[in-house]
């Protein structure tokens, strides 16, 4: 009888500190979450109406060791069980990134564990692999506070940005519009909730740009909302905030979904993946589902809410691919706030 040899599992420890979440996770074989611990700082930044870099860094320093220990305990493993450490090296806030990178390097050095640097957006894309195995070619619609882009992938680890924002990211526009409507930070979830109570009765612009472009632009829309509110105040006219939220959200989603759908057809992809913090938006999820339900040959993958916002499981998932492809970082690894996903 032939001997049955079980392939060894690949256990990756992920570390994410690019913005205002301190996160550590353990992922098996790039697809299975063993532990996923996130310490959020939203309450600390709320009163400032946005993330304060210095406060974010200070919180990361306080939390990183605690979160790391908690993840190992939750996974019921020791450092000896870990094949590699994957850490977000960029993009993000440089001071915040440094805390995660230095923690990863310290653990890698102390326990002689291989180190892998991960691009934050690659992490968001690979969060989908924790839901379902990905199939190539694929298209990822990345929508977050700092990024709005369409990324085409022919194979693992290969990223081609075919469309990106020329000014504000969608998440940025959400936060600024929320502030105009006197809503707390982060604005996205509040606008989303309010939009479901209103009707899109206010005519707002949609930036389609050139006919063949997959790029985005949200600064004109953001300005139009601010001007609408300002003009209404000057004239003493009452605008229903829920209608303004619904109109703004419809304008954003129209452009995102239409361009993603067009790109999916043009590039003949097998799957479309939703990624990034704004992927938690109920309106966007519903419109994408309706759009891609009509396309028989394209599978839409939408991650659960817990994997949309920043977390370390997605970094471990992306890190697994990099590790299996033989990519390694040295202890000279540094935070790179302007890291390019195509490099």
Swiss-Prot record:
InterPro entries associated with the record: ATPase_NBD, Gcp-like_dom, KAE1/TsaD, Peptidase_M22_CS, TsaD
Obligatory cofactor(s): Fe(2+)
Name this polypeptide is given: tRNA N6-adenosine threonylcarbamoyltransferase
Localization terms from the record: Cytoplasm
One Pfam family per UniProt: TsaD
The protein's Enzyme Commission number: 2.3.1.234
Role, per record: Required for the formation of a threonylcarbamoyl group on adenosine at position 37 (t(6)A37) in tRNAs that read codons beginning with adenine. Is involved in the transfer of the threonylcarbamoyl moiety of threonylcarbamoyl-AMP (TC-AMP) to the N6 group of A37, together with TsaE and TsaB. TsaD likely plays a direct catalytic role in this reaction.
Record note on cofactor: Binds 1 Fe(2+) ion per subunit.
GO molecular function per UniProt: iron ion binding; N(6)-L-threonylcarbamoyladenine synthase activity
Protein family per UniProt: Belongs to the KAE1 / TsaD family.
Domain of life: Bacteria
GO cellular component terms, A-Z: cytoplasm
Binding-site list for substrate: 142-146, 175, 188, 192, 281
Reactions accelerated catalytically: L-threonylcarbamoyladenylate + adenosine(37) in tRNA = N(6)-L-threonylcarbamoyladenosine(37) in tRNA + AMP + H(+)
Keywords: Acyltransferase, Cytoplasm, Iron, Metal-binding, Transferase, tRNA processing
């Amino acid at each position: 009888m032939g001997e049955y040899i079980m392939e060894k599992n690949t256990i990756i420890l992920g570390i994410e500190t690019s913005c205002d979440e301190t996160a550590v996770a353990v992922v098996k074989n790039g697809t299975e979450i063993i532990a996923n611990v996130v310490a959020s700082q939203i309450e600390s930044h709320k009163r400032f109406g946005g993330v304060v870099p210095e406060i974010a860094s200070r919180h990361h320093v306080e939390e990183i060791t605690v979160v790391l220990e908690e993840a190992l305990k939750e996974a019921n493993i020791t450092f000896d069980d870990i094949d590699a450490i994957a850490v977000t090296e960029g993009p993000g806030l440089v001071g915040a990134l440094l805390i995660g990178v230095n923690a990863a390097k310290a653990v890698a050095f102390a326990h002689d564990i291989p180190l892998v640097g991960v691009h934050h957006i690659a992490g968001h894309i690979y969060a989908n692999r924790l839901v379902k195995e990905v199939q190539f070619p694929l298209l990822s619609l990345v929508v977050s506070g700092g990024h709005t882009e369409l990324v085409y992938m022919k194979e693992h680890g290969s990223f081609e940005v075919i469309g990106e924002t020329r000014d504000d990211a969608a998440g940025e526009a959400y936060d600024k519009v929320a502030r105009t409507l006197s809503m707390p930070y982060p604005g996205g979830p509040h606008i989303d909730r309010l939009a479901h109570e209103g009707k899109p009765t206010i005519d707002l612009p949609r930036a389609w740009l050139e006919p063949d472009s997959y790029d985005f632009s949200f600064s004109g829309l953001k300005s139009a909302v601010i001007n609408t509110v300002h003009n209404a105040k000057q004239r003493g006219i009452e605008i229903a905030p829920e209608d303004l939220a619904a109109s703004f959200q419809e304008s954003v989603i129209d452009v995102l979904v239409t361009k993603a759908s067009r790109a999916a057809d043009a590039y003949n992809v097998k799957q479309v993946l939703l990624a990034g913090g704004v992927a938690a938006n109920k309106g966007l999820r519903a419109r994408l589902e309706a759009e891609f339900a009509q396309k028989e040959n394209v599978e839409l993958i939408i991650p659960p809410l817990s994997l949309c916002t920043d977390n370390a499981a997605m970094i471990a998932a992306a890190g697994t691919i990099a590790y299996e492809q033989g990519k390694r970082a040295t202890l000279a690894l540094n935070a790179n706030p302007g890291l390019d996903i195509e490099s």
